[in-house]
Amino acid sequence: MDEISSMLDYLGIKSTEELFSDIPLSVRKKEIGIGSPLDEHLVLERARKYASLNSTEMLNFLGNGIYDRVIPEAVNYIISKSEFLDSYTPYQPEVSQGMLQSIFEYQSLISDLFKMDFTNASMYDGYSALGEAARMAYRINGKNKILIPESTYDSKLSVLKNYVWGLSMKIEKYKMNEEGKIDIDDLQSRIDGDTSAVVVENPNGYGVIDENVFRISEIKKESLLISYVDPISLGVLKPPGEYGSDIAIAEGQQLGIPMNFGGPLLGIMSFKADYVRKSPGRLIGESVDADGKRAFVMTLQTREQHIRRAKATSNICSNQALLTLAAGSYLSILGSSGLKKVALLTIKHSKNLAESLGNIGIEKVFDSISFSDTLFRIDKNVMLDLAKKGILGGIKLTSLIKDSKYSSGTFFTATEKTDNEKIKALVNALEVIM
Amino acid sequence: MNFKQAYYEEPIIKDIKSSNTFSLSEQVDESILPENLKRKDLELPEVSEYDVVRHYTRLSQMNYTVDVGIYPLGSCTMKYNPKFADRVSAIDGFRNIHPFQPENTVQGALHVMYDLQEYLKKISDMDAVSLQPMAGADGEFTGILIVKKYFEDKGEDRTEIIIPDSAHGTNPASATMGGFDVVEVPSDDKGMVDLEALRAAVSKKTAAFMITNPNTLGIFEQNIEEIAKIIHNAGALLYYDGANLNAIFGITSPGLMGFDIVHFNLHKSFATPHGGGGPGAGPVAVKSFLKDFLPVPIVDFDGNSYRLNYELKKTIGKVSSFYGSFSILLRAWSYIIRNGDDGLKNVSARAVLNSNYLKKKLEKYYDIPYYPLKKHEFVLSTENTGKRALDIGKYILDNGIHSPTVYFPLIVKEAMMIEPTETVSKADLDNYADVLIEALKLSDEELKSRPKNTAVRRIDEVKAARDLKLKW
């Protein structure tokens, strides 16, 4: 007897249909309508066919949140190991020490990189991490206003709005100056007794490295400082912990995660130790086992939804654990020297890009140092023409910030992969198009 | 099975001493950056790639996985994931595309997303789908925002979300995030929503009722049509938590049951390795009258090409950066076409058969409360045995099987929540039952000494919380 028959036999029923007898006939479904099963090799054939309709061989000058960076093959190898890839949330820590230690190491690596006290391991992406940071600020001080730079992209603002909608928090934009940096006077005039947090970005939405963020802690009064940073840039730029950030957040895709058409991503969130009990998401702590051996375990779970339900600090359940492993192994392989090199090459290539475009009369919008996204004055929409020539790039600032005053602003992005040969190809293409 | 998990005295990565082997040959001068912007010190480890790989390989051997053995815990559907789904998501043409690429350079990706939207509509009998939410709970939050915007648009001030006491913890947490007050309704003696209590809870303040069906006790809410009537008569919306959808593929659907909003947990119901906790994907589907409220973009097809549609009139906007967890969407898409109608229906049939078979094997030994016929999962209580669920769970680990979810749902004392899934054989179920029955023969002292075949033994969780060490 086959296993199904013998199980049916044991239950004393004739078919599995009888196990659904509690579902009223009035809500029964006739058929799904997907069709017949497809053999595995045919699924792969179909997938490869569709994948071939996507262009991946083009020169990539796109960025503004997702970046085409060098990923050591070992990172992909490590996250593909089935013991990481197909394990569950470590609710049973005794059999999950590998995952737990890897997350603990991620928390430590990011805390060191950001110079912050603690880091969680749960945010979906940078944008939702910003939303969670705003909610956390509200939990900390109960104030109702949050200030963000006018260079914040509409999509990021939209996510933030949704996250604070239920709290009725007000979001207010502050101005940027002619260098594309924070207008300190404008920001200062907006900070009042009801300001929960000031959000700063470095590099900011214009791609500019903004040293004015280093001065915000002096003017922020009782409000909290939330810094949104580029984790790669921290290989050379001052870390958020050094300029008084209370919460520091980032999009972690650049740390060993492929572009994947924009998802899944990794939201990074670090914060001061004082605020740990107000923080969202999961935390892994070190302890000992019954024999006194070092062991890791999920901790402060009493803040989480499965225990606190309506009073939880977030609703996070499935999260980005595997991607923390990618980021942890990426940072471990690059080390300080590797990350510094990647960051410096990014700045060098951005500079080369600006100089080369400058040579054909395409000027930068801001006379400031940019990290990877550089904003140029180009009235024409060049994106589709460039795509015909095998080049991806030329996002208009107005497609990211609809009512921006820099209507000619067009982005080209450089990473450590953007060498002179690629820049030359872009210059040649633009010369023809413009 | 004789089980023994590997243990290494593995140092943390920072304490591994070797030399960095990462290299990029192009030279760059540090003076490119002004001193005032520069960081002074950076203290990441400097380790060779081979030592990093060895480190993580040793860690991996101290980690249980569904590829080593069964993972029969409730409410999170840890089934074997077919390997072709991973292969699909690893194809270069899918991995290496940028979200801002012109639409004509990503037609294949948009095609897959469009097809997945269509499949999810068919499976759920709903009218429109947004693939954007990044996880199940993110889908819940999205659904709650849609509820909020819908009533704001209608000019109605509704402040409460009703939730059963057996619900997943994410439900009340998501409702609260949206600014609603949570009203809990109790279960009746059969483990279903108490209709009288529901009627009493519903009012002009009710915005929605959130429920999963089958519920977390593995019981199908047979009064679902009556529930829908009560909620709709009050002018409120009915929200379906899709966490347990894999129990009803092809048998019934949220749309047929009268739900207005659904989220899917693609990573549970279809195919995605669980990644030690994620990533997941939590698309949201709605009935047509709510389509305009969905997060944007959704994917449209005009007969020739696919495009991202941002033009939904009353959209809540965005809940994440781009278009959702694309690589997870790919896995779900490939799993759905691989299985087709018959395969998906078989998934449910076998999951429910496995659950009822195991339940029957255990019911002579453990108290299994509430309505007898279960769906994909069931909850037993160890209270009648005098043993603690936690202790039995630790003994199970020693036998090479992952423990059930313990102490959930909160309405069952000493709960163990078991979901075998469709990918567990009869032989594994028999063995699992034997282990659970054997556990009862052990003394309390013996049980408390478990586990001992695992990498580490029972961990001092109080110390972890008291002497908080979250960083090396």
From Swiss-Prot, chain A:
SUPFAM superfamilies in alphabetical order: PLP-dependent transferases
**GO molecular function per UniProt:** glycine dehydrogenase (decarboxylating) activity
Q: What is its EC number?
A: 1.4.4.2
Q: Which Pfam families match?
A: GDC-P (PF02347)
**DNA-binding: present as a keyword of the record?**
no
In terms of InterPro entries, this protein maps to:
GcvPA, GDC-P_N, PyrdxlP-dep_Trfase, PyrdxlP-dep_Trfase_major, PyrdxlP-dep_Trfase_small
**Reactions catalysed, as given in the entry:** N(6)-[(R)-lipoyl]-L-lysyl-[glycine-cleavage complex H protein] + glycine + H(+) = N(6)-[(R)-S(8)-aminomethyldihydrolipoyl]-L-lysyl-[glycine-cleavage complex H protein] + CO2
Q: Name one GO biological process term.
A: nucleoside metabolic process
Q: Which UniProt keywords apply?
A: Oxidoreductase
**Role played:** The glycine cleavage system catalyzes the degradation of glycine. The P protein binds the alpha-amino group of glycine through its pyridoxal phosphate cofactor; CO(2) is released and the remaining methylamine moiety is then transferred to the lipoamide cofactor of the H protein.
Share what the entry says about its subunit structure, partners included.
The glycine cleavage system is composed of four proteins: P, T, L and H. In this organism, the P 'protein' is a heterodimer of two subunits.
Q: Fetch the NCBIfam families from UniProt.
A: PRK00451.1
Describe the family membership recorded for this protein in Swiss-Prot or TrEMBL.
Belongs to the GcvP family. N-terminal subunit subfamily.
Q: What is this protein called?
A: Probable glycine dehydrogenase (decarboxylating) subunit 1
Native source organism of the sequence: Thermoplasma volcanium (strain ATCC 51530 / DSM 4299 / JCM 9571 / NBRC 15438 / GSS1)
Swiss-Prot record, chain B:
Q: Which GO terms describe its cellular component?
A: cytosol; glycine cleavage complex
The scientific name of the source species is Thermoplasma volcanium (strain ATCC 51530 / DSM 4299 / JCM 9571 / NBRC 15438 / GSS1)
Could you say which enzyme class this protein belongs to? oxidoreductase
Q: Does the keyword Oxidoreductase apply?
A: yes
Alphabetized, the UniProt keywords read: Oxidoreductase, Pyridoxal phosphate
Q: Per its database record, what is this protein's job? A: The glycine cleavage system catalyzes the degradation of glycine. The P protein binds the alpha-amino group of glycine through its pyridoxal phosphate cofactor; CO(2) is released and the remaining methylamine moiety is then transferred to the lipoamide cofactor of the H protein.
Family in the record? Belongs to the GcvP family. C-terminal subunit subfamily.
What reaction is this protein's catalytic activity?
A: N(6)-[(R)-lipoyl]-L-lysyl-[glycine-cleavage complex H protein] + glycine + H(+) = N(6)-[(R)-S(8)-aminomethyldihydrolipoyl]-L-lysyl-[glycine-cleavage complex H protein] + CO2
Q: Report the EC code(s) recorded for this entry.
A: 1.4.4.2
InterPro entries to which the protein is assigned, alphabetical: Aminotrans_V_dom (IPR000192), GcvPB (IPR023012), GDC-P_C (IPR049316), GDC_P (IPR020581), PyrdxlP-dep_Trfase (IPR015424), PyrdxlP-dep_Trfase_major (IPR015421), PyrdxlP-dep_Trfase_small (IPR015422)
Annotated GO biological processes are: glycine decarboxylation via glycine cleavage system
UniProt GO molecular function: glycine binding; glycine dehydrogenase (decarboxylating) activity; pyridoxal phosphate binding
This protein's record includes keyword Metal-binding:
no
Question: What cofactor does this chain's UniProt record say it requires?
Answer: pyridoxal 5'-phosphate
**Which positions does the record annotate as the modified residue N6-(pyridoxal phosphate)lysine?**
268
Q: Which gene encodes it?
A: gcvPB
Q: What is this protein called?
A: Probable glycine dehydrogenase (decarboxylating) subunit 2
Which HAMAP family has this protein been placed in? GcvPB
Which Pfam family is an annotated match for this chain, by its short name? GcvP2_C
Q: How does it assemble?
A: The glycine cleavage system is composed of four proteins: P, T, L and H. In this organism, the P 'protein' is a heterodimer of two subunits.
